[in-house]
Amino acid sequence: CGASFNIYKFLEIVSPALFKEYSLEKFMEKNIKIEHVVIKEEVKKPDISSAPPCEQIQQLSENHKAICFLESRKIPKDMWNRFGYTSLFGSYARDVNKDYSLIEDERLLIPIYDEHNIFIGVQGRSLANIKPKYITLKKNEKIKLTYGLNTLNLSKRIFVVEGPIDSLFLPNAIACLGSGNFLEVREKFQNQDLVYVLDNEPRNKNICDIMNKLIQTNEKVCIFPNHIKEKDINDMVLKNLDVVSIIEQNTFSGAAAMLAYNSWRKCK
């Protein structure tokens, strides 16, 4: 389209009435503070005894492939205890569910726990040039997996992303493990304040369709500004961008979200 505006300027030009309404809404969000007493609860540690045994990250040498991967993706060290490692993923998969039959490749393990800290599945990330890059396993095929349930604070805003690694860079976030699952999240969190952060792929029809449906149901969505070219949160972190601020400043709903969405699709 050739022109680039932030959402405020865009609304002011296209719809002055909506611009006033949106500006007032943002003003109210920033200036009304409700003070309340917060009782801090100790975060329960995952019940690792409920998960199949694997090598813990802290047991690996500093030049190990798994360590090098975590460092290369700038994953904070205080998050490393959320990962594991296996050189025999096929055997590990059978320990998760005897019906799995997979090759014995080496993978970084991302265990998935429910809200009671019980192991319900795992995502394996290839550390070699093997496809698929990610394989998700379920202990029980009937269970819908969501990453991050065991660390969630339901009284705070919840950020919803696609992949577990992206979720580690946001406060109080979950990963729905596949773009097709975004539309099912509200079913589980009917009364919570959700913000959906889809990958920044305006030419991906599937992503666009999902975002459009979320907007139509009046959900809050992050629509990245035109100057952000990185595809996902981790890529933005690698470019030293302040992803939390970017997301907070570019979260919209209703008519403002639809205007931003249409601009996002045209200008990328």
Descriptions of predicted regions:
Residues G2-A3, Q58-H64, F224-P225:
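Short acidic alpha-helix initiation/capping motifs at coil-to-helix transition points
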